[in-house]
Amino acid sequence: MNSQANYLLPVPLSSEKLCARGFNQSWELARRIDCDKHIHKNPHILRRHHHVQHQAQENRANRQIAIQGMFYINPQYQDCLESASVIVFDDVMTSGATLNEIARVLKDNGVSRVINWVLLRTLYPSS
């Protein structure tokens, strides 16, 4: 499983949603992926600022706007990302807005390569 990556990171939930649900489904799946020992799995590097309303009915443009500025890097891990290759794992991808925003944040913080792994892809109407 992609031996060139340094980290495997799940898409984070907001603290509100994590407390309500009790677990991050992306992390529960990602931590069970059998990958090379040197790929560090870590649910604490990526953080989400706050919860927004459920976006299931939003069009692609509105999703991209709503997700801007939503994610950040935990300052405790900032230095370890310099020139790293990172796999971002999401359970379900709809428009790709979340993964695009996370990739932007990671690259803005020194990551050299972002690879997206997605378990399921929804059918999304073009709009």
What are the residue ranges of the model-derived segments?
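Conserved PRPP/pyrophosphate-binding segment of the phosphoribosyltransferase/PRPP-pathway fold
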Residues: M1-V88, S95-S126
